Swiss-Prot record, chain B:
Family, per entry: Belongs to the TAF6 family.
Protein's name in the database: Transcription initiation factor TFIID subunit 6
Gene expressing this chain: TAF6
GO MF, any single term: RNA polymerase II general transcription initiation factor activity
Compositionally biased residues, Low complexity: 467-482
Keyword Nucleus part of the UniProt annotation: yes
Disruption phenotype: Lethal when homozygote. Reduced pollen tube growth when heterozygote.
GO cellular component: SAGA complex; SLIK (SAGA-like) complex; transcription factor TFIID complex
Biased composition (Polar residues): 427-436
């Protein structure tokens, strides 16, 4: 290439970039000394690649159609590549796609950006639907600046794991087609982690889903931290096991005969069912059965969870409460895929579309509902059960003033909030109700006095969720202001503020040992925070839409999270890895709950079903089984469809069954 | 560009008083408007999710505006969903249906009902992992369960194992329900309540677990209570309600039900009192049988053949009582005219010769016997008539009958109407019909005459049928029912024919068929005419009649 040409390129380039004066200077300079020998420090003549590269710089730099061409070429190449490497190569497509789009928007080609986006969005809708919906609205450079999601995408690089050969294939393609534009985007925004060997199977794609690369790094870094997921020392379960031994000794003579009974009990209960005796009888039967099972419990817990010390000063439990809990624990029936639980279903009727949340106290005797008209209503199920014989209820009304302060009402009305109530939960003994609302406050109510005790102000935006710690006294809240906070009942200021989520914190849950809380967010991650230090100790990445519900297994080892799409993920807390996604729901998973032994997971969803999952088998599944892909079906034990009633809240009570409630709209 | 066109921005600008908005400014604003709307929607969806809903409401949008520190738009949070209307002439332009309300109407309107207060109801969604079949639960599982049992039945028959959970969860409510129904069926004291019960049986969704109990109950009571006419009738009503219930999967229990129904059809003696109208019961049972055959004939291929065999055996056994014959004829007739043609008409001649002595008052001294014989004769005539009617109806509709023909038909009515009077005399002495009913039958011919004059078209065609069918007319106790029956017979026959002859015959095929069948039918008609005399004529559709005559 002769210097004349080079000059032309340079001038053309400068003009394109808007340095017209510089271009003029250069031109005039060249006119002055026409020999132009000073430019040849690089040997352009022998490097055609470089020539092309430079030429392409000067050629229509701004032409929006180049994005489209480049992308569609890359796309067809990727789709026609070798099957073995195809899924890896296809991973590149999404980052390239969104950055092409954002480049186009950034340069002001709104029209072209739109058509480009629409023509290729189908490719990515499967996995990235939510992100696409967000990006779709970005139409001007200022939006790019404003929107946090877009900003973080622009700033960070995406990590993509590539096997050696895929990487070479890609480079080869980019060089041979001289698609400098694509090359530029890929260089700028993608960070390849090349590893030697065969490409990974496409099923491991979950990690490829999250796009924010630097974020992934920090996540990996954070996830290195050590956590103590064990149960508390000297917990009631511990004491139960100790006393359980004693009990079974003292009851040995009795116990043996009962053991025989227990085997028969299955049969017996079915017989009773046939004869159609009352439910109460059934319960009693099960309770009798349960005592026999306590003895077995010891043998089953072969590898007990490690014990840890509490980092918080925990409240002292009164002996009465302790006794009753111990009693409950003793009566607990071990649930498994063979011994299925009973499900009692509470339906809210005539809610006029206003029920936002509901919850059930730990002993199942109280049910609370939070409504969009700022009210909270608490029902005492025992009283409803007593007066259940219909006609009697009406007669009792006048005499029962204390229970029904407003005459005919069957519930206690708690008024105080000034916005929709988004959560209402009971303290473990059931003497307090904690509610959070769109009016940015959290309120504490007493179920004994039926009155508001404290109003906690601290959040700046609607408080989406508030949860008591497993031992009461402390509680956690989370809000639209992207923080989660820890409070104690006796202070009106938060004790800790957990900040770090990139979007709303939608749900919060305590770890059984009280040292950690987990939060689920609209940024599609779940985080685990240390309560004592307020630091984030785990980030769980894998959900494809906003996380709506969380549950911790009773042994503290696992966590389940449910999202907007109906996917439930089981996480191992120590490794921060997803054990298994549980697919089955096709709409929002509103609530999750583990059974007392941690062997079953119940999920309630907006698709009007309650599903039971066998989580013991899923954790023990071998790799081979998982590869078969049908493991999902094995894990899903039962589906209970309701009569078009979305399921809002679930609680596995201490005794033996799941309680669920919901609303008819 | 953006989904908000610049015209929209201009229109909105005008509506808030900005008239001099530059087109460029509108063009710049449009994408921003879209972005803001999307932003609001994103927040609104969050609010919706936290309200645990899957439909976005106006209050969610208000909530989202609050989050952005924007004043909410008032006047939309009405609770109910909006009604959108399509703008006429535009494909995707919608507006809210916001009617003007007259102030006066609002003031004068009565107070609306107070909204019901929120309540909690409780039920078992599952008991030890099994969903009980109660009305509160979705009926999905309930319907599926028997299908599974059927498969098992065919395979290796561990029937008990599979059905157990359904029995097992028979709730207290269901037991009470069953008891109540059983009591009602036995007591026969409270007809309106019983009717309610039947409606509930025919429509309730949670009754499936009770089906085996009901079939058992019916089978037991039918075999024990053959003397109790009312009870039998009640039981048959239960059967019909169960068959009608769309939530019940009755197939596996049919084998238990069929004997009871057939018993009510062809039993020698139903009810012990003289007044018991067992004919009606037999007719009812016949309808049930045909209903069952129609619905489940495709699943149980042997069902109809077994049934017809039973009925034909009953019919052709001269030792069997006339009541049994009657039941058999009605049962066969209800199965459609193909069955009648194949099974009754072929045996018609010998049977009639057998029946002849019984009909004759001189030869048969027992009045009751004569009455029964006439009943049978009537049933036979009706069956044959409907059959020939159905056959002739296959022909494509011919031009509507000319008025002159109607007169002819009436003329015949008059001619034959001498017959019934004769017969009625014999019947009246033995029959203890209610006076009112007799009155109707007596009035029959005269009424027709008067109506003939007034000339109400549909009645004219049908009334002769009634007249010309003396045995039915004179002895049918519920004359009103029978009358309507006769009235419907024509239209219904058309339907029966259509469904019966479901092999889709194209128009051309029909025409071919006609010419082939023409002779055949003609012969059949002649034969029937020989046997029945003019009594068969009213069954023949008028137009065809004109052809044959």
């Amino acid at each position: 290439m002769d210097p004349e040409q080079i000059n032309e390129f340079v001038v053309g380039y400068l003009k394109k970039k808007g340095f017209s004066s510089a271009a003029k200077d250069l031109e005039s300079y060249h006119h002055q000394n026409n020999n132009g020998s000073s430019f040849t420090s690089v040997d352009y003549h022998n490097d055609p690649e470089l020539t092309k590269l430079i030429r392409s710089f000067s050629q229509q730099e701004d032409d929006p159609t180049r994005y489209r061409e480049g992308y569609s070429k890359l796309r067809s190449w990727a789709y026609n590549s070798l099957d073995l490497y195809k899924h890896e190569l296809l991973r590149v497509m999404y980052p390239v796609f969104i950055h092409c789009y954002m480049d186009l928007v950034g340069k002001g080609h709104t029209q072209e950006a739109r058509t480009f986006f629409n023509s290729f969005r189908k490719d990515h809708e499967m996995v990235h639907l939510r992100d696409l919906q967000k990006l779709e609205g970005v139409l001007s450079p200022s939006h790019l600046e404003e929107m946090e999601f877009a900003r973080s995408l622009r700033k960070s690089k995406v990590n993509i794991k590539f096997c050696q050969y895929s990487y070479e294939l890609l480079l080869q393609y980019l060089h041979s087609t001289v698609s400098t534009l694509m090359l530029g985007i890929i260089n700028e925004h993608i960070n390849f982690q090349v590893y030697s060997g065969q490409p990974t199977s496409s099923s491991d794609d979950i990690e490829a889903v999250t796009i924010v690369g630097s974020f992934q790094d920090t996540a990996n870094h954070i996830n290195q931290k050590e956590i103590q997921w064990g149960l508390l020392e000297d917990s009631l379960e511990d004491r139960l096991e100790k006393t359980g031994g004693l009990l079974s000794d003292s009851e040995k003579g009795q116990g043996e005969s009962k053991d025989g009974d227990a085997d028969d009990s299955k049969k017996r209960s079915t017989e009773i069912g046939k004869q159609g005796s009352s439910l109460k009888k059934l319960k009693k039967d099960k309770a009798g059965n349960a005592t026999a099972k306590v003895a077995r419990l010891e043998t089953i817990t072969v590898s007990p969870a490690p014990r840890v010390k509490p980092e918080l000063a925990l409240p002292v439990m009164s002996t009465d409460v302790e006794q009753s809990i111990l009693e409950d624990l003793r009566n607990r029936v071990q649930l498994s895929s063979v011994a299925m639980p009973s499900v009692s279903f509470y339906t809210f009727v005539n809610t006029h579309n206003g029920l936002n949340c509901s919850s059930i106290s730990h002993d199942g005797s109280l049910v609370a509902g939070g409504f969009s008209d700022s009210s909270i209503k608490v029902w005492d199920m025992a009283k409803i059960g007593q007066a259940g014989s219909g006609a009697l209820q009406a007669e009792n009304d006048s005499s029962d003033q204390s229970i029904r302060p407003n005459g005919r009402r069957s519930y206690t009305l708690l008024l105080g909030h000034s916005g929709p109530v988004y959560s209402a939960t009971f303290s473990p003994p059931g003497d307090f109700v904690l509610s959070s609302s769109a009016d940015t406050t959290i309120r504490l109510w007493s179920t004994k006095l039926n009155a508001n005790l404290v109003c906690y102000k601290g959040h700046n935006y609607p408080v989406w969720d508030a949860q008591f710690s497993p031992f009461g006294h402390y509680f956690a809240s989370c809000s639209h202001d992207r923080t989660a906070r820890i409070w104690s009942m006796d202070r009106i200021q938060p004790l800790r503020i957990m900040a770090g989520h990139l979007s709303d914190v939608d749900c919060v849950q305590w770890h059984p040992n009280c040292n950690y809380i987990a939060t689920g967010s609209s940024d599609k991650t779940v985080r685990l925070w240390d309560v004592q230090t307020g630091e984030c100790v785990r980030i769980f990445i894998g959900h494809r839409s906003m996380v709506l519900s969380l549950a911790m297994s009773p042994d503290g080892r696992y966590m389940a999270s449910g999202d907007e799409d109906g996917t439930i993920m089981m996480w191992d807390l120590s490794t921060a890895r997803c054990i298994t996604p549980l697919m089955g729901h096709n709409s929002c998973v509103w609530s999750l709950s583990y059974s007392g032994e941690g062997s079953l997971l119940a999920s309630g969803s907006a698709d009007c079903t309650v599903k039971l999952w066998d989580v013991t088998s899923s954790t023990k599944l071998t790799k081979a089984e998982e590869k078969n892909g049908n493991s999902n079906r094995l894990r899903s034990l039962r589906t209970f469809p309701t009569k078009s009633t979305p399921v809002h809240a679930l609680r596995v009570s201490y005794a033996f069954f799941t309680r669920i409630n919901s609303t008819i709209l | 560009m953006s989904i908000v066109p610049k015209e929209t921005v201009e229109v909105i600008a005008q509506s808030i008083g900005i008239t001099n908005l530059l087109p460029e400014a509108a063009l710049m604003l449009a994408p921003d408007v879209e972005y803001r709307v999307r932003e609001i929607m994103q927040e609104a969806i969050k609010c919706m999710r936290h309200s645990k809903r899957t439909t976005l409401t106006a209050s969610d949008v208000d909530g989202a505006l609050n989050l952005r520190n924007v004043e909410p738009i008032y006047g939309f949070a009405s609770g109910g969903p909006f009604r959108f209307r399509k703008a006429i002439g535009h494909r995707d332009l919608f507006y809210t249906d916001d009617r003007e309300v007259d102030f006066k109407d609002v003031i004068e309107a009565p107070l609306p009902k107070a909204p019901l207060d929120t309540e909690i109801v409780c039920h078992w969604l599952a008991i030890e992992g099994v969903q009980p079949a109660i009305p509160e639960n979705a009926p999905l599982e309930v319907i599926r369960a028997p299908a599974e049992t059927k498969i098992h039945e065919q395979k290796d028959g561990p029937l008990i194992d599979v059905r157990l959970p359904v029995k097992h969860v028979l709730s207290r409510e269901l037991q009470l329900y069953f008891q109540k129904i059983a009591e009602l069926a036995m007591s026969k004291s409270n007809p309106p309540l019983y009717k309610e019960a039947l409606v509930s049986l025919a429509s309730d969704s949670g009754l499936h677990p009770l089906v085996p109990y009901f079939t058992n109950f019916i089978a037991d009571e039918v075999s024990n209570g053959l003397n109790d006419f009312r009870l039998l009738f009640n039981l048959m009503h239960i059967v019909r309600s169960l068959l009608q219930n769309p939530h019940i999967h009755i197939e596996p229990y049919l084998h238990q039900l069929m004997p009871s129904v057939v018993t009510c059809l062809v039993s020698r003696k139903l009810g012990n009192r003289f007044a018991d109208n067992h004919w009606e019961l037999r007719d009812f049972a016949a309808n049930l049988v045909s209903l069952i055959c129609k619905r489940y004939g495709t699943v149980y291929i042997t069902l109809q053949s077994r049934l017809t065999r039973t009925l034909v055996n009953a019919l052709l056994d001269p030792k069997k009582a006339l009541t049994q014959h009657y039941g058999a004829i009605q049962g066969l007739a209800a199965l459609g005219h193909t069955v009648v043609r194949l099974l009754i008409l072929s045996n018609l001649e010998p049977y009639l010769s057998l029946l002849e002595p019984e009909l004759n008052a001189e030869k048969q001294k027992n009045q009751m016997k004569i009455y029964e014989a006439w009943r049978v004769y009537g049933a036979l005539l009706r069956a044959a008539g409907l059959c020939i009617h159905g056959r002739l109806k296959i022909f494509p509709p011919l031009p509507s009958p000319s008025p002159s023909f109607l007169h002819k038909g009436k003329g015949k009515g008059k001619i034959i109407s001498t017959d019934p009077h004769k017969r009625k005399l014999s019947v009246d002495s033995s029959e203890n019909q209610s006076p009112q009913k007799r009155l109707i039958t007596m009035d029959g011919p005269d009424g027709v005459h008067s109506q003939d004059q007034s000339g109400s078209a549909p009645m004219q065609v049908d009334n002769p049928v009634e007249n010309d069918n003396p045995p039915q007319n004179s002895v049918q106790p519920s004359s009103s029912e029978q009358a309507s029956d006769a009235n419907e017979s024509e239209s219904r026959n058309g339907k029966v024919k259509e469904s019966g002859r479901s092999r889709a015959i194209t128009m051309k095929a029909i025409l071919d068929q006609i010419w082939k069948d023409d002779l055949d039918s003609g012969r059949l008609l002649v034969k029937l005419h020989e046997l029945y005399g003019d009594r068969i004529l009213p069954f023949i559709p008028s137009t065809e009649m004109s052809v044959f005559l």
